[in-house]
Amino acid sequence: DIQKLPKKFTIRIMAFGVNNIVELVFWPVFLFSVVNAYTSFGLIFLIAELAALVGAIWLGSIENRNKLLKILRIGGVLCSLIWLSRIFITGALILAAVTIVGAFLHNLVEIPFNTLEYDRIIKKRYLAEFVVFRGILESIGKIVLLGVLAIFMHYNAAFLTSAVMYLTFLF
């Protein structure tokens, strides 16, 4: 039964919701406010997506599940550090570099987590129910983040929340 999923799993899925909205909405808006040029902004995200693609290809070749778990934990720490650094960095060039590195590192969390969890879910034969449950949990994570931002009203609150959420992948 899907209701019997471990609590740490549900928290990790909510963390994905938080991290996705920060990465796909708040970070680009913040970065554009610093870079302030469409071509530079587009180039940064083009290079970031290429870095993410390289990471995805590399991670896709790993079949050892124990190795994936180790990569997941390392990725959680590194992504957390990247998001913490975004609070303190101000220069456009360094922000661009952090964006590119962050895109690669995000795959160190997302691909191993999805691989390990889908393996487990498929074995228990409730994939359709899981997909719906995952969507609900990601939405709850997004609502939590928006609540935090409603209180603190600053980009740094989103970046700090994302840093903390990446640490949930250590356990």
Where are these regions (language model features)?
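Intracellular loop-helix junctions on the cytosolic face of multi-pass helical membrane proteins
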Residues: D1-I13, V164-F171
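Primarily residues marking transmembrane-helix entry/exit sites
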Residues: I2-T10, Y38, A92-A96
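A membrane-interface helix-boundary motif in multi-pass transporters
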Residues: G147-L170
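Structural signature of the two symmetry-related core transmembrane helices
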Residues: K70-S85
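Short amphipathic helix-loop junctions that connect adjacent transmembrane helices
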Residues: V25-G42
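Helix-loop junctions at membrane interfaces in 12-TM secondary transporters
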Residues: S85-G102
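Substrate-agnostic recognition of the 12-TM MFS/MFS-like secondary transporter fold
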Residues: L5-L24, A48-S61, V98-V148
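Interfacial helix-cap and linker-helix signal at transmembrane-aqueous boundaries
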Residues: L31, I62-N64, V148-M153
